[in-house]
Design a protein with these regions (language model features):
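Bacterial Sec-exported substrate-binding components of ABC uptake systems
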Residues: 3, 19-54, 153-184, 233, ...
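Bacterial N-terminal signal peptides
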Residues: 9-18
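Short helix-initiation/N-cap motifs at beta->coil->alpha
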Residues: 33, 87-98, 217-226
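Structured C-terminal subdomain patch of bacterial secreted/periplasmic proteins
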Residues: 45, 140-141, 145-148, 157, ...
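A short, structured surface patch at a secondary-structure boundary
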Residues: 45-103, 107-113, 213
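Alpha-helical, coiled-coil/dimerization segments enriched in small aliphatic residues
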Residues: 73-75, 193-221
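Short helices/loops that flank or line small-molecule/ion binding pockets
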Residues: 97-105, 123-124, 224-233
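Extracytoplasmic ligand-binding site segments that recognize negatively charged/polar headgroups
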Residues: 132-145, 184-200
């Protein structure tokens, strides 16, 4: 492997070791990015308006700690057959304060779309934090914290170790044989909106050593113009959210690119790749395997 490739891989993998999390443990408290804090202890009546947090609690076997949840419009929260039956406090973007209070929670976990709800909870002195998974490392840190919140530290550690093994295995494969591809994960096709480098999908692409052609564009869901698409000539395009079929990606400009000509168009599971639960590691493996096929064509 030449020096440039080694340096690129070093930069690709080193970011994981940077200590900066969306939730931090400081002096016996859990502190979020917005400086909200709660005590690091076991809770018994948790209201969650964060899909990733709901999935993590089920994976820990701590569903008995869930008092109620915020529901989603589009994507499903796993395990669907159980989460569909949970009491609701409304939508995750704007859960009802009245409904939250009706469940007498000792902890509320929100997502970044419901920050205004946090302002109301603060006035009512209801303990809450805002969870924002931006990096793979955040998932590991959240596992540690949620294990403490639910009294399931051993279970959290087991899931942590499994996820770490999956990530380390991917690292080893990439170090041995880099993908050297470029592409994008699209949000919608008309106009063509993609995930930038600051998103969780962007983080995954960076981890895999893939150049995100929308990485440096402005906005959280930047527009990829036809000129940019043709100029960058991506090796692949992946669809998420409202894009349900590879055929939806076959726009005229796309067909002029390597991705379109070679039909390197596929769909990723939005409920995994956009959600910071340990299920993401499985989707990363699938994404990697899809890219290996493309690389070897």
């Amino acid at each position: 492997m030449n020096i440039k490739k080694r340096f690129f891989l070093l930069l690709t993998f080193c970011f994981i070791s940077i200590v900066s999390y969306s939730l931090e443990i400081k002096d016996g408290m859990v502190v979020d990015k917005y400086n909200n804090s709660v005590e690091l202890k076991e809770y018994n009546r948790i209201v969650l308006a964060d899909p990733a947090g709901i999935e993590i609690l089920y994976m820990l076997g701590a569903e008995d700690k869930i008092a109620a949840i915020g529901k989603t419009f589009m994507s499903k929260i796993q395990p669907v057959e159980k989460t569909n039956k949970l009491p609701s406090v409304g939508n995750i973007t704007k859960p009802s304060i009245e409904k939250i209070l009706s469940f007498s929670p000792d902890l509320v976990i929100l997502n970044t779309m419901s920050i205004s709800t946090g302002d109301s909870l603060k006035k009512l002195k209801i303990p809450f934090i805002i969870s924002e998974t931006e990096k793979i490392d955040d998932i590991f840190k959240n596992l540690e914290i949620y294990g403490e919140f639910t009294g399931k530290k051993a279970e959290a550690d087991a899931i942590y170790q499994d996820g770490k093994k999956r990530v380390d295995t991917l690292k080893a494969k990439l170090e041995k044989e880099p993908l050297n591809l470029k592409g994008a994960i699209l949000y919608v096709t008309t106009p063509m909106l993609a995930f930038n480098d600051e998103s969780l999908p962007g983080e995954i692409m960076r981890f895999l050593g893939v150049k995100n052609i929308a990485g440096d564009l402005k906005g959280s869901r930047p527009i990829i113009s036809q000129d940019l698409l043709i100029r960058e000539n991506p090796d692949f395009l992946a669809g998420a959210m409202s894009i349900k079929s590879p055929d939806d990606l076959k726009k005229s400009a796309v067909l002029k690119t390597t991705a379109g000509k070679n039909e390197n168009l596929f769909i990723v599971d939005s409920s995994k790749i956009l959600r910071g639960s340990p299920r993401l590691f499985e989707e990363m493996e699938k994404f990697y395997n899809e890219l290996v096929i493309i690389k070897n064509k």
